């Protein structure tokens, strides 16, 4: 259930209300972002409303209206600003109260707009967070030279993280650069290590379907089936970020994958929406905006840079005094992870559409914390809508869970058959930085 960590969620709640006075509440839309959320109330007639902060993490929206709001409570998992929207105790008999629970301290503003006899009130909630650190100084000069490549006949979905002309990038520095190569997995007999992240767990059940099916139980079942498929294939080794009903933080999941020397991470979830007719699977990859913010964070954390996998950690451990090199290496690492993630997501979608409905036919981009690692390419798979009666029954079915695991496995296998992992001796690709050229992707096309 990752409706709360997408770039923006637009959810419609149907309302059955008995109008009192001139205005009737007709619709609610919620856009839930990482640091900002918008709740849009639509009215027929000029509304009478008010809002107040019951605490820094709770906002009460009062509307002159009676009736029953269907679709509440709307529960999010807590990775974005809004944690839940629920009905509250009204202050009088002529008022409805919506209570918005936040994951962080927040501040609220309201703007009313009119369109003929229709009105909207937009409540904008901003997280009360300290300002971000200033951006690092310009630390690298890039010289981009297009290379001539043969046009492709057709592609089902173009990878936006690939340059259209397969560019090479020169990084000018006084140091010597070792290019981060796709890492070998010698300790496991050159197997490709796939970290499988079963979403939620423990006190966090995730989404709960109309029949009571809990997302955390669906995700761990699919994850275990996927691990079995991977471990039965000599190409792979599957490892779980959790193998029981317990909670792991978003950051902790990436750390577990890194400790396992994972080459790729698959996070498994089940979607949910107030619109109970929504169906289908989708696959999500890290957005550029989140990648840029994560890169700035890694540049600040010099002591953690050496933990990065794939050769980048070794390079950065010896470049503490050279911010030019640090940014260049991290930029290459994030770019590589995004490109690989998008291509694997495309491969998975082609398999998922063979077994069921597809909600998004191309990989979607979002600010997802579990996909934040620059050194581990990753995707998040929404296996279907647990909020839909039919898909809830499918997701709870052992047979369909097996089909989902097989689709994810085949997507991984098809990608890595076409793009075998390569290893290189440390320093084998070293060149002087003024002449180094780095291919558009580390894994060959």
Curated annotation (Swiss-Prot):
Stored CDD domains: MurNAc-LAA
GO CC field: outer membrane-bounded periplasmic space
Gene Ontology terms describing biological process: cell division; cell wall organization; FtsZ-dependent cytokinesis; peptidoglycan catabolic process
Localisation: Periplasm
Keyword Cell wall biogenesis/degradation annotated: yes
Signal peptide bounds: 1-22
EC code: 3.5.1.28
Listed GO MF terms: N-acetylmuramoyl-L-alanine amidase activity
Catalytic activity of the protein: Hydrolyzes the link between N-acetylmuramoyl residues and L-amino acid residues in certain cell-wall glycopeptides
Entry annotated with the keyword Glycoprotein: no
NCBIfam families xrefs: PRK10431.1 (NF007751)
Function, in words: Cell-wall hydrolase involved in septum cleavage during cell division. Can also act as powerful autolysin in the presence of murein synthesis inhibitors.
The protein, known as: N-acetylmuramoyl-L-alanine amidase AmiB
Species of origin: Escherichia coli (strain K12)
Gene name as annotated: amiB
């Amino acid at each position: 259930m990752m409706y709360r960590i997408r770039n923006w969620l637009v959810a419609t709640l149907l309302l059955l209300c008995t109008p009192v006075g001139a205005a009737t509440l007709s619709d609610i839309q919620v856009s839930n972002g990482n640091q900002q959320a918008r709740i849009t109330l639509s009215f027929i007639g000029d509304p009478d409303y008010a809002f107040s902060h019951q605490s820094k993490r709770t906002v009460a929206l009062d509307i002159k209206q009676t009736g029953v709001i269907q679709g509440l409570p709307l529960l999010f998992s807590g990775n974005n600003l809004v944690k839940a929207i629920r009905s509250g105790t009204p202050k009088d008999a002529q008022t409805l109260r919506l209570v918005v629970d936040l994951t962080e301290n927040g501040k609220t503003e309201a703007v009313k707009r009119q369109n003929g006899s229709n009105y909207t009130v937009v409540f904008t909630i901003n997280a009360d967070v300290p300002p971000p650190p200033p951006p690092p100084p310009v630390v690298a000069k890039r010289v981009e030279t297009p290379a001539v490549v043969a046009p492709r006949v057709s592609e089902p979905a173009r990878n936006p993280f690939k340059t259209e002309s397969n560019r090479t990038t020169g990084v000018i520095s006084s140091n010597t650069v070792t290019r981060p190569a796709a890492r070998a997995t010698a300790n496991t007999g050159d197997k490709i290590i796939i970290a499988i992240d079963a979403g939620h767990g423990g006190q966090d059940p995730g989404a709960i379907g109309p029949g009571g099916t809990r997302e955390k139980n669906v995700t761990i079942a699919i994850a275990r089936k996927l691990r079995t498929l991977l471990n039965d294939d000599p190409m792979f080794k599957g490892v779980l970020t959790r193998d029981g009903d317990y909670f792991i933080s978003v950051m902790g999941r990436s750390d577990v994958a890194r400790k396992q020397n994972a080459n790729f991470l698959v996070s498994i979830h089940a979607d949910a929406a107030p619109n109970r007719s929504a169906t289908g699977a989708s696959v999500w990859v890290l957005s550029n905006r989140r990648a840029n913010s994560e890169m700035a964070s890694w540049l600040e954390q010099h002591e953690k840079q050496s933990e990065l996998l794939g050769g980048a950690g070794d390079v950065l451990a010896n470049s503490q005094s050279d911010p030019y090199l640090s940014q260049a290496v991290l930029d290459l690492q994030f770019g590589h992870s995004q490109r690989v993630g998008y291509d694997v997501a495309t491969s998975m979608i082609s398999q998922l559409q063979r077994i069921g409905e597809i909600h998004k036919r191309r990989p979607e981009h979002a600010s997802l914390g579990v996909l934040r690692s620059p050194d581990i390419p990753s995707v998040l798979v929404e296996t279907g809508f647990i909020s839909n009666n039919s898909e809830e029954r499918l997701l709870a079915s052992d047979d369909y869970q097996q089909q989902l695991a097989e689709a994810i496995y085949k997507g991984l296998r098809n990608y890595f058959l076409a793009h075998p992992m390569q290893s290189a001796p440390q320093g084998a690709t070293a060149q002087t930085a003024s002449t180094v050229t780095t291919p558009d992707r580390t894994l060959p096309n």
